[in-house]
């Protein structure tokens, strides 16, 4: 796993946690992007690809 893939995995976990805590997707996405150095499009794509 590359560093970018690892960051994306962590960001996806963070995004899902914030959504589970009641944040709406746009706010959770912004908080995650502010906290972690990941590409917005890659994170949204990973989120949309979840089962």
Each predicted region: which residue ranges?
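C-terminal alpha-helical interaction appendages
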Residues: 1-51
């Amino acid at each position: 796993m590359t560093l970018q893939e690892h960051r994306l995995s962590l960001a996806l976990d963070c995004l899902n946690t914030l959504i589970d805590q009641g944040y709406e997707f746009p706010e959770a996405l912004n908080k995650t992007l502010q906290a972690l150095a990941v590409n917005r499009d890659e994170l949204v794509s990973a989120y949309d690809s979840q089962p």
